[in-house]
Amino acid sequence: MGGMQVQITNLTEWLADQGVRQDVLTTGIPGIPRTLQLRDRLTVHSVRFMTLPFKSSQTGTVFLDQSWFMGAVKWIVLNGKKNNYDAIHVHASGVVWPLLAGMFAQKYLKKPLILTIHCSRIFTYKPMNKWDQFVHDFVKSVELKSIKLSHKAVVLTDKRLDSYNRLLEDSSKMTAISDCIGSNHLSHSIDCPFCSRLKTELLGKKTVLFLGRIAHEKGWSTFVSVAKELADKIGDLQFIVCGDGPQREAMEEQIKAANLQNQFRITGFISHKFVSCYLHHAQLFLLPSHHEEFGGSLIEAAIAGVPIISTNNGGPADIFTHGETAILKDPGDVSGIADEAYKILTNDSVAESLRLHSRPEVVSKFLPHCVYPNYLNLYSSKEAAVHEG
């Protein structure tokens, strides 16, 4: 699962444990049951309308988002009015289809709409191709309309909240609730069997870690280019990519062109329970995203005590202080990022300073008990009360 999906999973499970009944509509994949009961009050429905056998460099499968939208609308029409829902919660990430589905559900079911904007199309998102650029203004207008129709709209940082407050005539419905750290990262033991195996495999070599979806917005091409510069300067390094995505083949081609095949490992998608293992065995976490609304993996890295380099746009600049709790550079600044990475990997005092300063700040703000009750308060508000049981 990607970072947003991990955050949604953790949130829905926590809410279910607090007594909130939920039906979650997701894409799913072929071979997985259409309905999964994850908790007594938490049911996940795979609602994809169809799966086409054509690859997409952006979404993985052609018409994946549209397929989910059609399936979600069908499910809402067939099942929505059978259940006495109190609210509709849509998680949006710069893609138009969840926004349209949320507006349809709000009109059809006549229930309050709660919108969480994991990536703002208006302020954060950067179009990835010519078609994306062509529809950019339209999707921004849909995002704005969704916010105006919503009962409450959630953004992930105070900075983004300020941006929307300046844009909207009525900003009273806007609020900021951050991502948070999964409980598995708080209780992880480096003596676990997988950590022991990983330690043996790494042979004591310094490791630079990339954690995320292999897609344009995560800056994987910058990561490989930085790896090339570091390998030329330091030599005996390993680069681990935890994740998969629609541009994996392109990444592998760039790695081959840089003659780095023997220093790279791409794990593919891994269970989130193993993410802590990789973080605890890395000497540097590098996430050079082109746009990043928050960056859940960044706070996970901070908890694990890994020095961090990311970009100074969106969430990373809101979470961290450059030079104190993380290093933040411009997107695509290969030489600048490589220079900072070299300092961290060759100077223990630089790495230790970043480690010591980042973890306390993250712990004070992004633990589950600091974050999730804010959503429960939204659900329990007078206009959108959710009944337990």
UniProtKB/Swiss-Prot annotation:
Membership in a protein family: Belongs to the glycosyltransferase group 1 family.
Catalytic activity: 2-deoxystreptamine + UDP-N-acetyl-alpha-D-glucosamine = 2'-N-acetylparomamine + UDP + H(+)
InterPro entries given in the database record: Glyco_trans_1 (IPR001296), Glyco_trans_4-like_N (IPR028098), Glycosyltransferase_grp1 (IPR050194)
Gene for this chain: btrM
Protein name: 2-deoxystreptamine N-acetyl-D-glucosaminyltransferase
GO MF term set: 2-deoxystreptamine N-acetyl-D-glucosaminyltransferase activity
EC number assigned by the record: 2.4.1.283
Pathway assigned to this chain's UniProt record: Antibiotic biosynthesis; butirosin biosynthesis
Membrane-spanning parts: none
EC category: transferase
Reported function: Glycosyltransferase involved in the biosynthesis of butirosin by mediating conversion of 2-deoxystreptamine (2-DOS) to 2'-N-acetylparomamine using UDP-alpha-D-glucosamine as sugar donor.
Comment field (misc): In contrast to KanF enzyme in S.kanamyceticus, can only accept UDP-N-acetyl-alpha-D-glucosamine and not UDP-alpha-D-glucose.
Assigned keywords, A-Z: Antibiotic biosynthesis, Glycosyltransferase, Transferase
One GO BP: antibiotic biosynthetic process
